[in-house]
């Protein structure tokens, strides 16, 4: 069951991450364009093919991190999740640039570090981390329950 559970969680978090990113970029673009002569009510976001496996890797963090800290203070957990996300975002962006020649999200605005992470996204990453924590706890419980009744 461990392999099946990990695979299902990988697919779940890949889809959740891609969906969240598309919503975030659509909202960001709509807000950024507000007030310009070309303002549109189009809700059009974007993501990259590389993000599917990157977001899927969240499934490996559940047993390592979430299971250990989910009962801690919410602010401490949010901070830890943001630091982990920033670290993974920096590493994956750097690796993509090294191996493919470009980082698809290379930041040029805001408080960025080498273009790989934006510190001004910390609150968004804190919220995303807490959301992922709850999804992981729920999905893990459902999968464990299902496996217990359907071995």
What do the PLM-derived regions correspond to, one by one?
Residues 1-151:
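Aromatic-rich, lipid-facing transmembrane alpha helices and their immediate juxtamembrane interface loops
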């Amino acid at each position: 069951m461990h392999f099946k559970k990990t695979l299902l969680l990988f697919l779940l978090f890949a889809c959740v991450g891609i969906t969240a990113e598309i919503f975030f970029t659509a909202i960001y673009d709509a807000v950024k364009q507000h007030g310009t002569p070309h303002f549109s009510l189009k809700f059009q976001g974007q993501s990259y093919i590389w993000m599917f496996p990157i977001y899927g890797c969240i499934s490996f963090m559940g047993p390592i991190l979430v299971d250990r800290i989910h009962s801690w203070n919410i602010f401490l957990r949010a901070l830890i999740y943001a630091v982990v996300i920033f670290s993974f975002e920096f590493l994956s962006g750097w690796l993509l640039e090294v191996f493919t020649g470009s980082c698809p999200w290379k930041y040029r605005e805001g408080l960025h570090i080498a273009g790989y992470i934006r510190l001004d996204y910390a609150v968004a990453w804190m919220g995303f981390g807490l959301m992922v924590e709850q999804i992981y706890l729920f999905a893990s419980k459902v999968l464990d329950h299902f496996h217990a009744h359907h071995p």
